[in-house]
Amino acid sequence: MKLKALILDEKAMNRTLTRISHEIIEKNKGAEDIVLVGIKRRGYPLAKRISENIYKIEKLKLRVESVDISLYRDDLSRLSDQPAIKKSHPIDVEDKKIILVDDVIYTGRTARAAIDAIIHSGRPKLIQLAVLIDRGHRELPIRADYVGKNIPTSRDEIVSVEISEIDKCNSVKIYEV
């Protein structure tokens, strides 16, 4: 893989997450009844950061939950394009405003599986989607409500989101395969 571009460095990522936090507050007329649900793996730490930002702005501590969505894969090939919902703790979503958080939206399949998991847990007041990066190429009619950055990509490129909680650094890069 060859590095094509650095899209966000640490400062730009922090500014982007701060903007998303403000947009969530503005669109929801405050932060009451909001539960942030991060899609594991990188969506969960991003949801925690958004929660911290909202606390700084509104002085309101939000609940942060996670949902584990992953693709069935073996070491050599993809066995299925369908995301698998792994069992995680039940999320109380009843009559709450759910903000689903992920690092990258691509085909929309992961977001769809996460929405299904949330609806299976109860009846939320609403579900909104916040993503750090929207790279296009949707295969389902799913659109993020909050987007950090739109990055037009080819299907041959890889968008790599690195966050300090997992990767020891914060950046978004595009690689050519």
Swiss-Prot record:
Q: Gene3D superfamilies this protein is in?
A: 3.40.50.2020
Q: Where is this motif: PRPP-binding?
A: 98-110
Q: Keywords in alphabetical order, please.
A: Glycosyltransferase, RNA-binding, Transcription, Transcription regulation, Transcription termination, Transferase
Output one GO BP term. DNA-templated transcription termination
Could you say which EC number(s) this protein's record lists? 2.4.2.9
| CDD domains named among the record's database cross-references | PRTases_typeI (cd06223)
The record's section on Pfam families has:
Pribosyltran (PF00156)
Organism domain of life: Bacteria
Enzymatic reactions? UMP + diphosphate = 5-phospho-alpha-D-ribose 1-diphosphate + uracil
Q: Which GO terms describe its molecular function?
A: RNA binding; uracil phosphoribosyltransferase activity
Please give the NCBIfam families that the UniProt record associates with this protein.
Answer: PRK05205.1-4, PRK05205.1-5
How does this chain assemble? Homodimer and homohexamer; in equilibrium.
PANTHER family associated with the record: BIFUNCTIONAL PROTEIN PYRR
Q: What does this protein do?
A: Regulates transcriptional attenuation of the pyrimidine nucleotide (pyr) operon by binding in a uridine-dependent manner to specific sites on pyr mRNA. This disrupts an antiterminator hairpin in the RNA and favors formation of a downstream transcription terminator, leading to a reduced expression of downstream genes. Also displays a weak uracil phosphoribosyltransferase activity which is not physiologically significant.
Q: Which family does it belong to?
A: Belongs to the purine/pyrimidine phosphoribosyltransferase family. PyrR subfamily.
- Any idea what this protein is called? Bifunctional protein PyrR
Q: Which organism is it from?
A: Clostridium kluyveri (strain ATCC 8527 / DSM 555 / NBRC 12016 / NCIMB 10680 / K1)
* Gene name as annotated: pyrR
